[in-house]
From Swiss-Prot:
GO terms for biological process, alphabetical: peptide transport; protein transport; transmembrane transport
Region ranges (Disordered): 1-25
Main location per the UniProt record: membrane
Keyword Protein transport annotated: yes
SUPFAM superfamilies: P-loop containing nucleoside triphosphate hydrolases
Example GO molecular function: ATP binding
Organism from which the protein derives: Brucella melitensis biotype 1 (strain ATCC 23456 / CCUG 17765 / NCTC 10094 / 16M)
Keywords: ATP-binding, Cell inner membrane, Cell membrane, Membrane, Nucleotide-binding, Peptide transport, Protein transport, Translocase, Transport
Membrane topology: Peripheral membrane protein
Protein name: Putative peptide import ATP-binding protein BMEII0205
Pfam families from the UniProt entry: ABC_tran, oligo_HPY
Lineage: Bacteria, Pseudomonadati, Pseudomonadota, Alphaproteobacteria, Hyphomicrobiales
Enzyme class per UniProt: translocase
Length: 376
């Protein structure tokens, strides 16, 4: 079976009737008949009233919700006494709806990966609330509480080389979740591995090979196949294409889009590359110093960002046109051990006012978006 041909990030109108899972303006190619034939059926407290209605007004089922989510890291004793606590995630409220991709962007150290790890139970949260499929997860929930949710929420790591055991054949690695679940015979497990490898565009004969025999893009396909083994409903993709070159990034992004259309998946897509997030997301949340500063539909946020930090992020992206203006965000991200009293972006903001220095801005609903800024 030949390797899946190289794909390009798709632009332009390629079909007249986009699927309900597509981002605004996205026009992807339909799946092949073979891909459609082998598809796996998808598996079927502090918030203001106006914000709650905003989150639910589109009618889609919300399958992930966080309210005022906080994660603190205890760094030990202060020299002057007391505990030294780093707040990596500060009162983050997000939703992910069935069949959509939420892009989570921000600079390094903004808390993106920490949020993703809390949503799959790799890290406990300190305070706030996490609800998955309507079930509340306690801050330090035991493994038994997570067990019925494990197969429904899976994680795709940034470095596929580190995510795979170098001494384990890839077929065995893909089958590992099936072994843990323990509900398939050996023949059924082998058939499922073959199905998963075909699903991500790899020949089934590769199952006997070891990870070092594959390229970075092929290894990431293997990691995705393993994540799909138990028919999850949500994939948390933590910088899933950051370690790949541009051509491989395009292939993996298109693979994730195809899988979403075919299996009805929801994605939390964590990245710092704004171009990739724009290609794959339906909605985008912008994170700064552990706090959400703006969320909204992808098209609206990219065309007219409301928060000064969102604007600065987009303006800092290099453009291919010669002589195109490019602005660089002045200053550095504040230390999470000593954040400003008011708005965390205030020391770097060109539109800062006196109130910004003293009063943290609440997250306000502005049309179909939310923004934390005193300008609104």
């Amino acid at each position: 079976m030949p390797l899946r041909p190289a794909l390009h990030l798709r632009t332009g109108k390629l079909r007249q009737t986009p699927t309900h899972n597509e981002p605004d303006g996205w026009a992807g190619q339909p799946l092949s008949a073979a891909a459609a034939h082998r598809g796996v059926c998808p598996m079927s407290d502090v918030m203001t009233a106006n914000r709650r209605s905003f989150l639910a007004e589109d009618g889609k089922e919300t399958i992930v919700r966080t309210d005022d989510l906080v994660r603190d890291f205890d760094l030990g004793h202060r020299p002057e006494g007391g505990r030294l606590v780093l707040r990596a995630v500060d009162k983050v409220s997000l939703t992910i709806r069935r069949g959509e991709t939420l892009g989570l962007v921000g600079e390094s150290g903004s808390g993106k990966s920490t949020i993703g790890r809390m949503l799959v139970g790799l890290l406990p949260y300190t305070s706030g609330n996490i609800e998955l499929f309507g079930q509340k997860i306690e801050p330090r929930a035991k493994a038994a509480a997570w067990k019925p949710l494990r197969r429904r929420v899976q994680f795709v790591f940034q470095d596929p080389h580190a995510a795979l055991n170098p001494r384990m054949r890839v077929g065995t690695a893909i089958a590992e979740p099936l072994d843990v679940a323990g509900n398939l015979t050996r023949k059924e497990r082998s058939a499922r591995v073959d199905e998963l490898m075909e699903l991500v565009g790899l020949p089934t004969s590769f199952a006997r090979r070891f990870p070092h025999e594959f390229s970075g893009g092929q290894r990431q396909r293997i990691v995705i196949a393993r994540a799909l083994a138990l028919n999850p409903e949500i994939l948390v993709c933590d910088e899933a294409v950051a370690s790949l070159d541009v051509s491989m990034q395009a292939q993996i992004v298109n693979l994730l889009k195809d899988l979403q259309d075919q299996l009805g998946l929801s994605h939390l897509f964590i990245a710092h590359d704004l171009a990739v997030v724009r290609a794959v997301s339906h909605r985008v949340a912008v994170l700064y110093a552990g706090q959400i500063v703006e969320t909204g539909p992808r098209t609206a946020l990219y065309s007219d960002p409301l928060h000064p930090y969102s604007r600065a992020l987009l303006d800092s992206v290099p453009r291919a046109r010669r002589g195109a203006p490019r602005s660089i965000i002045a200053g550095e991200v504040p230390s999470l051990l000593n954040k400003p009293k008011g708005c965390a972006f205030c020391p770097r903001c060109p539109k800062a006012m006196d109130i910004c220095r003293d009063v943290p801005p609440p997250l306000r609903v502005i049309g179909d978006r939310e923004v934390a800024c005193h300008l609104y």
